[in-house]
């Protein structure tokens, strides 16, 4: 091992293009993690496996930017939660009207549409839903009364385009079309041209009228969902979850797992190896035989057994990875410790009666720190890929949206066979990029502290 100061390491590292590239990638990952934890609501993390939280999202939707490369535009999924509101209260009528403007410029019909509302009322309000199309044709969709209540009650409901009463209402307006509509779906009828069954592009206005709403009643929530086939910058999975959120939350989780395992393993191995090499004789022999036993154990089968029998918690898994990750570090640290303790200044300190702990901390440990930092950087990718592998096998913590867990879900629902590439490729790329950052940094440090590796 060469004697090299921290200043020299820094100077040489800044000359390394590989090291600089690794630092740039790592900085981007750290900034992504910080922004994710600050901006994205923590509820999206906590509710990742709660289907109710994602019910308004589309199922297995492609990313919206794919439309840039398609001649036939795919309809985007739209969640409209801020309608224009008009109210009218007089002796003749009490009306609250919600207007949802939908700009539809796609070459395919939407999958469906849903109107959901939450209403506090008394009496028996009447709800009428209609749509004014770009060609000026107005279609009545549904007219229904809510259950009568003398007391204030809170009522929530959803109206689906698949409801039979909506299809029945549209069939009664068949004269507005020049072709047969009986066999068509509701969304195909609503978004179709009058002369042919092709999408009608333009601005649609969905009107939701609440009649007999008194001044004491109030509409708490009103939302229109146009079910599209494209959503977000990363699309959605079969469980309707926004994959962009999963990928972003996976970044701090990957860094936590990788750094926690690598730092823990290196510290354990460093302390163990230095102490064994410094003490020597029977202590060294006993400690290294125990190290050999652990080194010979097949790590993956044991990790599988431990995760099944004890716990698949991400924190417990991190501990398991530390247990199997320090043995190789200990062997190298022990060999370095044996070399350093034979040097004159260490022998002089021994003759002067310095304590073992002081000699280790003052004379041996500082010389192993460059190796320790390089080992930490190089060990991170292994920890991340091991966690991803265990999660892919179904042995990870399902409550955390790690990249490995996303790949596991993709495999479970046959994403590869179904061509859902956006569910598979991005998490794989993120794992590769994160690993590459630490490999670049580790190799740059390794070439500095081991000059023989330089080319």
Q: What annotation goes with each model-predicted range?
A:
Residues 1-258, 410-428, 432-433, 446-455:
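Gly/Trp-centered helix-boundary motif
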